[in-house]
């Protein structure tokens, strides 16, 4: 069903660390971590006339602040209030014109806590090389960190003609896909 959201989510609740944790720190953390998962800076592009499967292309307008959002619970910040927020966030479809993920920082969770809600399209988390954005965030491996994001430059988006030629070349290489 085309109206059924095809994403998965996670909810992580943390104690606020000494020194605090805020939106800017979360954006910086995600920027650092997704540098190692290029798919999180790509979006889906349809091949004209449906001549081939959709392809992944770099999002030349990638904006981290679109994907990392902020919310706050009203006092008292109960678990039930958090669950109600999750119930509002998760059913909304992801924007297919952008990379297919969102992260929400939820402040004001009772007992001096905050939550991170993730929403990721299943195409990013299915398969051998798939990595959920939640796993990227809580990865404790220091070798997975680094400044690759600052040097990333998106590749030019293919033209319609290039997509059609690519789809036709794929059809010649794998004729069983045509049937």
Regions found by a protein language model. Name each.
Residues 9-179:
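Soluble acyl-CoA-dependent acyltransferase catalytic core bearing the H(X)4D motif
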